Amino acid sequence: MASSCTAFRACAALTAALVLFLIAYVLIKGIPNISWEFLSTKPSYLTDSVGILPDILNTLYIVLGTLVWVLPLGVGAAIYLTEYASNHRIVGAIEYAAETLSGIPSIIYGLVGMLFFCNFLGFQTSLQAGAMTLVIMNLPTVMRTTQESLKTVPQSLREGAFGLGAGKWRVIRTVVFPGCVDGIITGCILAVGRILGESAALLFTAGFAHNIYNIFVDGLSGAGATLTVALYVYAKEQGDFEIAFAIAAILMALTVIINLVATLVGKYYQKRRSI
C-alpha cells in the first residue's frame, strides 16, 4: 500500500514538474519580448517593426462572433433536450452524436468550414467564416456541458415546484437555473478558452492577414489572423521564435486567467447557493 502511494506521488510530482517547466520556459522566453509597442501597433515591413494589435483584435472578434451564436444555441438545445424532450431514444442519439462531434479533430472542422462557409455560402476567407466554423465545433461541447449541469438539479425540486402550480418555464427559470448556473457559466467560460486556443480550423477559414478592421463598418467580412494563427506564422513560416514565444506567453497568461475566472465564478455561485 505504501509503495503504491509513493508511486502515485512520484507520478503527480513528475507531472507537476513538467507543467511548471513548460510554463516557466515559455514565460522566460516570451516576456522579455513583450512591450507596449508590441501590443499596440500593427506589423510594418517598411520599418521592420512587429506588432500584434491586429491579431489581438481579430481574436476578440472571433471570440465574440462565436459566443453570440454558440451560447444561445447550445444552452437552448440543452434545455430542450433535458427539460422538454420526451423521446428518450432520440435524445440519446443526439447526445451520442454530440459526444462524437466533440472528439473530431479541429482540422476536419476547418476543412468543412472552408468548403461550406468560404466556398458554398460565399463568405470567402474571413473572420465570419472562422467564427461560424468555431460555432459548429464548440456547439456540442456547450450543449453537453449545460446538459450535465441541468441534470445535477434534483428531480424532487422540479416536482415540488410543479406541485405548487408553477409552469414549465417558470420552474426552469426559478428552480432549475439557480441550482446549476455555476456549472453552466463555468462551461461557457471554458468554451471561451477553447475558442481562444483554436488555430487549425482558422488556418482554413479566417486566413493569415494582419489587418485592423472596424467591426461596426466592416463586420467580420475580412480575413484576419488570430493570436494562435499569428504564432504559427511567425514560428513556422518566418522562423521568428522571439515573437512566437511572446505570443505564446500572452496566450498562456490568457488561458490561466480564463481558468481562474471559471473557478472563481463556480465557487461564488456555490457559496451563494449554500447560503
What are these regions (language model features)?
Residues 67, 146, 168-206:
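Transmembrane alpha-helices
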Residues 99-137:
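Generic hydrophobic transmembrane alpha-helix motif, especially the helices
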Residues 1, 73, 86-90, 95, ...:
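Amphipathic cytosolic juxtamembrane alpha-helices at the membrane-cytosol interface
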Residues 147, 151, 155, 189, ...:
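C-terminal transmembrane helix and the adjacent membrane-cytosol boundary/short C-terminal tail
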Residues 66-98, 111, 262-268:
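Transmembrane-helix boundary motif in ABC transporter permease subunits
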Residues 43-46, 50, 202-252:
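Interhelical loop and adjacent transmembrane-helix boundary motif
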Residues 1-10, 26-68, 233-241:
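Periplasmic/extracellular loop-to-transmembrane helix junction in inner-membrane transport proteins
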Residues 57, 61-69, 73, 77, ...:
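Hydrophobic alpha-helical transmembrane segments of multipass integral membrane proteins
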